[in-house]
A protein has these predicted regions:
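Extracytoplasmic metal-acquisition and chelation regions
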Residues: 1-184
């Protein structure tokens, strides 16, 4: 389970005997965290599985199975919807592979390190301004190192999420000769 400590705390706080806990990430091969502080605070695994196309598909199937078990009357609907969603994601995956097959540049930079599964799935290299959990502001040293990385790897776009400070993304983009593109 990718979010075990968080899920257990939430379930205990709910104090609801009828609550069904779904391990949406069951069967996933997790991206392991390497920063000891992040592991201590958040657990051993990157929780952003849904940002992988295959991870999102797996989670949808696990959720559908749990819903079907809890609500057998509508089980077929849950399962069909999950299969349809998985098929749509498979189309996206094939298109992504086709569109990036000849890409010489495999590096990208984001506001926070949420795309580890996507990077793993498609042989990409992710760098980020902030850590996996978008906590704290980056140091000037970190921004300088990222700017150097961007120039070396010809990274022309810094992807910035809503949760991350736009100032850091703008500063990095200016230093690296790149542009900032918002992602949601």
């Amino acid at each position: 389970m990718l979010f075990r400590s968080w899920a257990e705390k939430t379930a205990a706080a709910a104090a609801n005997d009828h609550l069904t806990i779904v391990t949406a990430s069951a069967g996933a091969s997790p991206v392991k965290l390497t920063d000891p502080e992040e592991v201590k605070e958040h657990g051993a695994n990157d929780p952003h599985l849904w940002l992988s196309l295959s991870g999102a598909s797996l989670e949808a199937k696990n959720i559908a199975a749990a819903l079907a078990k809890r609500d057998p009357k509508h089980a077929q609907t849950y399962e069909q919807n999950a299969e349809r969603f998985a098929a749509d994601l498979d189309v996206l995956k094939k298109q992504f592979i086709k569109d990036t097959a000849d890409a010489k540049r495999r590096a990208f930079v984001t506001g926070h390190a949420a795309f580890g599964y996507l990077a793993r799935d498609f042989g990409l290299e992710q760098k980020s301004i902030e850590d996996l959990f978008a906590e704290g502001e980056p140091t000037m040293k970190t921004l300088a190192e990222l700017a150097k990385y961007c120039r070396k790897n010809n990274v022309k776009t810094v992807f910035a999420e809503e949760l991350v400070s736009p100032a850091a993304s703008k500063t990095l983009a200016e230093e690296a000769g790149a542009k900032v593109v918002a992602i949601y």
